[in-house]
């Protein structure tokens, strides 16, 4: 969405300022998250207002003021336009997900990879999804496959959201949300598959 971001803001920023927009924005449900270079921090309110006006499906615009960091893989967000709420509903490949974009890790940019890996899971398999977050991969794997997925995350907010997401979706398989250190859960017993992608600090 980098080109779209530049196009949307071309009438409110100078050409030089527009060129400094080096990062795309993410839209998760009705929430937009944008990164703004230090040189344009003074323009963050007008950037947020313009995005809110131009993207009809958005109700909130947040500026990401820190990278993803810590054991819980969370980031600091500052509302710059619209509603100051960080929870929303996101849909992907036929599943509904309740996500909190500030309190639990989530990235819409991994959707293709999630779908690809979920397609490798077979009926009857047991899968340990380490760093499982709100259950994105886990629910996609169990949606049309009679498998059991243990979704493990050390972040209690992510674990609770995964539990809620498993309840609001119709699954052929089963997703079990576990809150804790994935190494403590997965070391003692074998699993047919382990999904252990650790998201980078985005």
Located regions from the model:
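Active-site glycine-rich loop that binds ribose-phosphate moieties when present
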Residues: 112-113
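Hydrophobic alpha-helical segments, chiefly the membrane-spanning helices
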Residues: 196-202
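Carbohydrate-binding surface patches
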Residues: 32-40
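Conserved small/polar residues in nucleotide/adenosyl-binding loops
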Residues: 185-195
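Conserved SAM/SAH cofactor-binding pocket of Class I
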Residues: 118-181
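Non-catalytic substrate-recognition/targeting regions of SAM-dependent transferases
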Residues: 13-28, 42-109
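Short amphipathic alpha-helix segments
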Residues: 4-14
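Residue-level preference for short coil/turn positions at secondary-structure junctions
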Residues: 28, 57, 92-93, 116-117, ...
């Amino acid at each position: 969405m980098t080109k779209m971001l530049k196009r949307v803001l071309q009438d409110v920023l100078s050409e030089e300022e527009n060129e400094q927009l080096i990062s795309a924005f993410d839209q998760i449900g009705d929430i937009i998250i944008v990164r703004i270079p230090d040189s344009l921090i003074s323009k963050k309110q007008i950037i947020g207002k313009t995005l809110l006006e131009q993207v009809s499906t958005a109700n909130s615009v947040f500026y990401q003021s820190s990278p993803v960091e810590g054991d819980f893989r969370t980031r600091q967000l500052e509302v710059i336009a619209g509603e100051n709420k960080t929870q929303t509903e996101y849909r992907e490949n036929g599943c509904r997900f309740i996500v909190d974009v500030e309190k639990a890790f989530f990235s819409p940019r991994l959707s293709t990879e999630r779908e690809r890996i979920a397609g490798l899971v077979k009926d009857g398999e047991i899968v340990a999804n380490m760093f499982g977050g709100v259950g994105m991969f886990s629910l996609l794997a169990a949606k049309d496959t009679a498998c059991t997925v243990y979704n493990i995350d050390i972040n209690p907010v992510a674990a609770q959201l995964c539990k809620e997401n498993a309840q609001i979706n119709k699954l052929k398989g089963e997703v079990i949300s576990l809150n804790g250190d994935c190494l403590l859960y997965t070391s003692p017993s074998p699993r047919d598959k382990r999904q252990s992608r650790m998201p980078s600090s985005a």
